[in-house]
């Protein structure tokens, strides 16, 4: 598929391993999780290996009182990159509520970018290309991939925001809380509209307007393209929902 070949070629220039200098950007990665199954528990532990990017600190925020919450704490204690583990009750705001809780209660001002992810994916190979391109593009919002399912948007399992635009993220999440009361309304009023609130944006993998993929979800409704992207490491993720 020619369009995929072009994307593979473009991705190669971002697959380098960066070196630490005095100008290396600092990154904070926030992992929102709900460790109510062993699959989700193991997803977080697995993903830490691939999120261990240069000059990157990690904060994990889990749901309180979940079955595998204590086990998660034990397993990640050996990862020095994890600076803090928080717990709050799970609610209808899902990952967005957890991410904003961290931003409101932890000092992120010393970081240049904040990356947001969750336990809905299992990462299968290094994603330096995502971090490298995010830094290179230096836009307010940087997603991993786009989608045209429902409307044009960036899927929210992995994205980054430049420090000076974090206030926009907090503002729109708080503003839309009155519209959110379920999983579907969280997707509708948080994920699908996120690109509307940022002036500059880009993503690592532009696939939303590929003719064979318009209006589809790459993880659930287009296995042909998904398998190609997985094998070429352009999309090195497995969705947990496909395993449980």
Residue ranges of each PLM-predicted region?
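ER/Golgi luminal nucleotide-sugar-dependent glycosyltransferases, focusing on the catalytic module
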Residues: 1-244
């Amino acid at each position: 598929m020619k369009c995929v070949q072009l994307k593979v070629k473009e991705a190669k220039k971002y697959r380098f391993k960066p070196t630490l200098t005095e100008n290396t950007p600092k990154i904070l990665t926030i992992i929102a999780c709900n460790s109510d199954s062993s699959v989700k528990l193991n997803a977080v532990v697995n993903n830490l290996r691939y999120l261990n990017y240069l000059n990157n600190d990690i904060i994990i925020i889990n749901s309180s009182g979940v079955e595998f919450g204590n086990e998660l704490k034990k397993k990640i204690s050996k990862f020095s990159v994890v600076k803090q583990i928080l717990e709050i009750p799970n609610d209808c705001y899902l990952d967005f509520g957890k991410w904003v809780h961290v931003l409101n209660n932890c000092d992120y001002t010393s970081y240049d970018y904040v990356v947001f992810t969750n336990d809905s994916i299992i990462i299968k190979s290094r994603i330096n290309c995502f971090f490298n391109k995010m830094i290179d593009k230096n836009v307010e919002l940087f997603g991993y991939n786009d989608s045209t399912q429902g409307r044009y948007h960036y899927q929210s399992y992995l994205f980054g925001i430049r420090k000076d635009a974090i206030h926009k993220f907090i503002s729109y999440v708080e503003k839309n809380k009155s519209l959110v009361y379920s999983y579907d309304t969280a997707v509708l009023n948080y994920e699908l509209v996120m690109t509307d609130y940022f002036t500059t944006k880009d993503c690592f993998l532009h696939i939303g307007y590929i003719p064979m993929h318009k209006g589809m979800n790459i993880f659930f409704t287009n296995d042909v393209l998904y398998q190609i992207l997985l094998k070429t490491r352009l999309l090195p993720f497995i969705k947990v929902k496909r395993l449980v």
